UniProtKB/Swiss-Prot annotation:
Main location: periplasm
Subunit text: Monomer.
Record keywords, A-Z: Antibiotic resistance, Hydrolase, Metal-binding, Periplasm, Signal, Zinc
Cofactor dependence: Zn(2+)
Gene that encodes it: blaB2
SUPFAM superfamilies, A to Z: Metallo-hydrolase/oxidoreductase (SSF56281)
Protein's UniProt name: Metallo-beta-lactamase type 2
GO MF terms, alphabetically ordered: beta-lactamase activity; zinc ion binding
Subcellular location field: Periplasm
Residue positions binding Zn(2+) 1: H98, H100, H161
Binding locations of substrate: K183
Amino acid sequence: MLKKIKISLILALGLTSLQAFGQENPDVKIDKLKDNLYVYTTYNTFNGTKYAANAVYLVTDKGVVVIDCPWGEDKFKSFTDEIYKKHGKKVIMNIATHSHDDRAGGLEYFGKIGAKTYSTKMTDSILAKENKPRAQYTFDNNKSFKVGKSEFQVYYPGKGHTADNVVVWFPKEKVLVGGCIIKSADSKDLGYIGEAYVNDWTQSVHNIQQKFSGAQYVVAGHDDWKDQRSIQRTLDLINEYQQKQKASN
């Protein structure tokens, strides 16, 4: 009986420690995905509903590469502080996968802390029209990067969530960062489509499937990223939306 009590106490203390660790930084949740690649999740409210935004960062021998940014500028510093605390390395590069604030909103901040910032020329054009901070460097829709010993690729699949949405492929890890063109497996609808190209979206997702058929993990832009049925769910949601549009006409 005493042995059982001791085990229960150990488990309880362990759980408390884990919970406390998770609560050290309520602004950002970080999960190790594979090797030196981490998923970070932040939260914000849209139309009265709280959503999670997912992106990744890669720890290289030169420093940390951040894809996109925390959702909300109030989380930027705590995020980079957490990275330094966890890995002892600074953010040296930031890439925005489209022009919305949950992706490109950190370009100015990352630039100010000394990181090189990047976006596609298409994203840069949109940001310029909206008088928003822009990346220091721009590139055409597709580009391969090498940072130290690490490599990854930015790919433009076509229009979908926005005209400028790109995905990021990590070949060694076989991880695809889908951004907002890929909906989570638990999504109920396509979300914000004010700048979407729904009629192009299906083909763009098929382009992703064909090019990255060897992906072991696909990280959806919002909410649950662990359920790997996100690509099929995205296609289903597009079809459902189109069918409703046809029925209403």
